[in-house]
A protein has these predicted regions:
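Amphipathic protein-protein interaction modules
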Residues: 53-97
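Negatively charged, low-complexity tracts enriched in Asp/Glu with abundant Ser/Thr
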Residues: 1-58
Length: 129
């Protein structure tokens, strides 16, 4: 399972495929937050550089903490950044290079995101009258 497949599936399941790819192309704002208890909230964003950020978030002392965040170049879906706030880790990969360790981690994380049910279409919960 690749992160590209996971992102595209989640975005499609939320009816946001066209908006997502337009944001990638034009570097416009795109934000999708997916709650799937008991797991941490998953956020997919498009950065001002046109990169795709995938992150799990939790709160610590009122601050949003990334656990982790991996930023991908959608041209080839190689990771360009890795952040793990709780450990104070930030890595930026130079253009034209890639990190085998981060790529391997991203593949494992993509499989975990799928296994945790983030890629499934959730039925709408009817409003209580």
């Amino acid at each position: 399972m690749k992160m590209q497949t996971v992102v595209e599936t989640i975005v499609a399941n939320h009816g946001m495929t066209e908006k997502f790819w337009k944001a990638v192309e034009t570097h416009d704002e795109f934000y999708l937050s997916v709650t799937n208890e008991p797991y941490m909230r998953l956020v997919i964003e498009v950065t001002s550089e046109g990169y795709v950020s995938v992150a799990h978030y939790y709160r610590q002392n009122g601050d949003a903490m990334r656990d982790p965040e991996v930023v991908f170049d959608p041209a080839d879906w190689h990771a360009v950044e890795y952040t793990q706030d709780s450990l104070g880790i930030y890595q930026r990969i130079e253009p034209g290079y890639y990190s085998q360790g981060i790529e391997t981690f991203a593949g494992i994380w993509a499989r975990n995101i799928k296994a945790q049910g983030f890629c499934e279409v959730k039925p709408e919960v009817p409003a209580v009258s």
